[in-house]
Amino acid sequence: MLLKKMKASLAVALVMSMSLLTACGGSAGKKADTTEKSGETQAAKEGNAAEGGTIKLGVLAPLTGTNAEYGKGFQVAMQMAVDKINADGGVKGKKFELSVKDSKGDQKESSDLARQFADDDEIMAILGDFTSGCCMANASIVDEAGIVQLSPTASNPDYAPMSKYCFSIMGLQSAEAPFAAKYLLQKYAGAKNVGVIYINSDWGTSAFSNFEKAAKEIGLNIAASVNYVQDEKDFSSLITKLKSANPDHVIILDQGAVPQIINQIRTSGWDVPLAALGPGTSEQLISQTGKNSEGLLITSPFFFDPENKELTAWKDEFVSKAGFQPTIHPACAYDTVYLIKTAIEAIDGDITREAIRDKLAEVDYTGVTGPIKFTENGDINRQYMICGIENGQYVIKEGFDYSKEN
C-alpha cells in the first residue's frame, strides 16, 4: 500500500527505461583549475590516449575490509554497464575495459592506486572510490594529472570542490544529515533527545557536523555523541555511554559497521528505537541483524520500486551476478559508467582526459538512480525519503514530498 502511495512521488527519481543509454547535453559550470600542470603531464593530458580499440577506466573500490559489500557492488554493477555498452556497439567504435583495484577502504592504499592510474596514459578516467576520505586523499593526485575521479558515493560536501576533476553523484551530507535530523527523527519519529554514534572518518565527521548543526537549529537535543575508528569491532563502551544519557532515539552514521552496532545494542538489552544514515537499503544489513533491525529507520535518496519493471529487471540481473540485493551504491556505480560514455559521445575530436572532464561537467542524464546534472562544484543535489524495516523487508515510510514545507 505504501508503495502505491509513493508511485507518483518516485516517478521522476526512479526513471529507468531501455533508453538508459541516451542523454542530452546540458550546461554546468565548474570550479577553476587549482594547480599548474607540468609540461610533461599537460602534454599527456592533451594527447589521445585512447588510440586503440578500447577505452580503459580505472576503478577504485574496497573489495576487502569492512566495506567489501559495497566494493563488490561497485565491481559487479560497473561490469554490467560495460558489458551492455560493449554489446550494443561500444562508444565511438571503441569498447570499454575496466581495471579494478582493491583500495581496502584505506586512504593511503587508495592514493597509491590512484597514482598508478594517473601515471598510466591508457587510463582515461577513474571511477571510485567508495568513501569520501579516500576520494579526498586522491584529489591532489587527479588534479595534478588532469584525470577525472568520478565517485559513485562520496557525499562529503568538501570533496568535489577540491579539484575541477573531482565529481560525485551520491548527493551531499550537507543535505542528507539535516534531513535525518529534521524529518526522520524530529518530525516522523517524534524524537526529542537523541544519541549519535558515528565513524571517525572524513565522511563520518562531515555527517555528524551537518547533523549537529541542523539539530541545534531545530531544537533537537543531542543527549550524547560517540565515535569510533575504521574497523572497530567492540562498541560496548560506546553503547554504555550512550545508554547512560537516556536518549529516546539513537542514530548510527556509517555504512559497514551498522549491522555490528545494531546487534551489540540489542544484545546489551537496550531496546531504544534506532535509525541509520549511510547503509541505504542494504539487504545484507537485514541478513546480518535479523530481528534486531526490525523497526530501523533510514534515509535514502532511492528505492527499488517493485512496480517499475525495468528497474526490477536491472535489480534481478545484479542479484544473479553479485549474489546479494543492491542498494543505491551499486546503482550509482552503474550510472558512473554511462556518465563517462555520455561524455565521450559528446566529444568532437580526440578522446582525451581533458575532453572527458569538460563534457562530463555538461552532462544532463537520467540513469538508474534518476536525473543527474552536476552543480558547478561537480556534485549533484538529491532528494531524500524515509524507509524502514518491517517484517524483515524495506518499505517506504515517507517519500520525497515529506520534506516539502507547507
Q: Where are the language model's segments positioned?
A:
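Bacterial lipoprotein signal-peptidase II cleavage site
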Residues: 21-40
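Extracytoplasmic "Venus flytrap"
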Residues: 51, 58-79, 101-108, 130-131, ...
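Periplasmic-binding protein-like
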Residues: 59, 117-130, 150-152, 194-198, ...
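Beta-alpha junction/loop-to-helix N-cap segments that form part of ligand/metal-binding clefts
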Residues: 69-76, 91-159, 169, 228-235, ...
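Extracellular/periplasmic bilobed ligand-binding domains
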Residues: 142, 208-299
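An alpha-beta-alpha
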Residues: 166-230, 249
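Extracellular/periplasmic periplasmic-binding protein-like sensory domains
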Residues: 265-334, 388-390, 394-396, 400-405
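Segments of small-molecule ligand-sensing domains
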Residues: 320-330, 341-394
